[in-house]
Regions:
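Conserved SAM-binding motif I beta-strand of class I
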Residues: 1-5
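Conserved SAM/SAH-binding beta-strand->alpha-helix loop
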Residues: 7, 109
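S-adenosyl-L-methionine
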Residues: 13-62
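SAM/dcSAM-binding transferase cores
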Residues: 42-43, 138-200
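A short acidic, Gly/Pro-enriched loop at the edge of an enzyme's catalytic core
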Residues: 60-70
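Conserved beta-strand signature within the Rossmann-like core of class I S-adenosyl-L-methionine
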Residues: 70-72, 99-107
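A short glycine-rich, Lys/Arg-flanked "PGG" loop and its adjoining helix->strand segment in the class I
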Residues: 83-99
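Conserved Class I S-adenosyl-L-methionine
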Residues: 113-138
Length: 200
């Protein structure tokens, strides 16, 4: 597998914490140490690379011939970390999916969902757990080249509700844009607010 991560501190702090280390076999700790120090781990069964740095540029370091059955994007919310929710970055992510590959995220933001739809991905709502019934969504699943006959029924996902579909026609669905691929979050948010102000 490949991972993209900008901040080494959580893993560094975890590996220094005895309570964390005691949760895992030494083999797992060795893998995590290698990832932290070297950015990769290899043995006969496991091959993993973690590319430390800005995901917008690091994604290009994944070899062109490698695509994924599943991509999980576990970033902060678009308002806090818009860099990884832009049209430009999500388009790069889509290109790394295999045919009928899946993209999954905790985000259910209208701007994210509208961008995924505009990238010709079929999107589904991830149902909240029973103990989180007060929430209307637990995230978004997007599938490339969706073929219902080849996809098993999944009790954890559902089509978007009428309310969710209507939400994609509001100003909230205006996407985040980063045409230069390296703009700071403040600039990306400012650009979107300007676009929203001109939207009817």
């Amino acid at each position: 597998w490949y991972g993209l991560e900008i901040d080494k501190r959580p893993l560094k702090y975890a590996l220094k914490n005895k309570l964390f280390r005691d949760l895992w076999d030494q083999e797992i700790i060795d893998i995590l140490n290698s990832i932290l120090i070297n950015g990769f781990f290899r043995d006969k069964q496991i091959k993993c690379d973690l590319l430390w740095g800005d995901a917008r540029s690091k994604i290009a370091q994944i070899p062109e011939d490698i695509n994924f059955d599943l991509i999980f994007l576990d970033g902060f919310s678009p308002q806090k970390c818009p860099e990884i929710w832009t049209v430009e970055f999500l388009e790069k992510v889509k290109k790394k999916l295999k045919p009928q590959g899946s993209f999954i995220t905790y985000s259910s933001a209208a701007a994210v969902r509208k961008t995924l739809l505009d990238l010709n991905l079929k999107i589904f709502n991830i149902k909240p757990n029973k103990d989180l019934a007060k929430y209307w969504s637990n995230g978004t699943l997007a599938i490339q080249n969706y073929n219902k006959s080849k996809c098993e029924d999944n009790p954890h996902i559902e089509n978007l509700s009428i309310m969710q579909i209507e939400h994609l026609s509001t100003k909230s669905s205006i996407p985040y844009r980063d045409p230069n691929g390296n703009d700071p979050s403040e600039e990306i948010i400012k650009r979107r607010k300007q676009e929203q102000s001109f939207s009817e």
